[in-house]
Amino acid sequence: MIEITLLGTGSPIPDPDRAGPSTLVRAGGQVFLVDCGRGVLQRAAAVGVGAAGLSAVLLTHLHSDHIAELGDVLITSWVTNFAADPAPLQVIGPPGTAETVDAMLKAFGRDIGYRIAHHADLNAPPPIEVHEYTDGTVWDRDGVAIRVAPTDHRPVAPTIGFRVEFDGASAVLAGDTVPCPSLDELAAGAGALVHTVIRKDIITNFPQQRVKDICDYHSSVQEAAATAARAGVGTLVMTHYVPAIIAGQEDQWRALAATEFGGRIELGNDLHRVEVHAR
């Protein structure tokens, strides 16, 4: 079984009720943090997960709303890990991830120096290993396998989606993307597809062109549902709602998805949990 927890279902716009985009995936005793939106560590703490307990951080792309708390994750995983010889935190993402991680560590350089000077058992900077991929297998440990494929979030490029497999169960995390054949292939037959969604019917009515531009490189509810249908997935898990779902309108969003997808449809607030079993 794979357990999916929507840690943050929000967007770049700060929301008092929704953390930034982030999803927790647990499989075979391993814990993966997919994207690091604002507030992610507080949300993770609410389900008993700390930064030092992460098996890996998986980044779909390097937009600010998806990496806003990456620096905090890097530092907190270091200062809260009390192992004598802690294993490096694994960070997996598209090309550009290593540069981003290096820049964040540089930004925290003074803090890192202060802590090394103060604590005898912190004698080196945070141990981190960065792996950059656009396609193929990125993880294969103790029964858990993860592979990636390109998605289409242009002009943001490259971007990737992740497929996590364990004991016959599978979950795909699409990140931000418009429909594309590579995502269809990655998601084919998966137990669940976690997909960001926007309401283009609402967004196109905003007067600001910058807001309307969001429609260029995100999937609408119906487009995400159509991707799920083409791929033959069991469950569509919608997240990263733009605009934020107003309480009482959940059925409206489900109904839009149901016009394209006949399977199980999940959406909810932060900390919404979905179990994915072998198909």
Swiss-Prot record:
Protein residues bound to Zn(2+) 2: 65-66, 176, 240
Record note on cofactor: Binds 2 Zn(2+) ions.
Xref: Gene3D superfamilies: Ribonuclease Z/Hydroxyacylglutathione hydrolase-like (3.60.15.10)
Keyword tRNA processing included in the entry's annotation: yes
Gene assigned in the entry: rnz
MF GO annotations: 3'-tRNA processing endoribonuclease activity; metal ion binding
Database matches in SMART domains: Lactamase_B (SM00849)
Keyword Zinc: yes
Record-stated family: Belongs to the RNase Z family.
E.C. number(s) listed in UniProt: 3.1.26.11
Cofactor requirements of the protein: Zn(2+)
Organism: Mycobacterium marinum (strain ATCC BAA-535 / M)
Broadest EC class assigned to this enzyme: hydrolase
Protein name: Ribonuclease Z
Keywords: Endonuclease, Hydrolase, Metal-binding, Nuclease, tRNA processing, Zinc
Record function comment: Zinc phosphodiesterase, which displays some tRNA 3'-processing endonuclease activity. Probably involved in tRNA maturation, by removing a 3'-trailer from precursor tRNA.
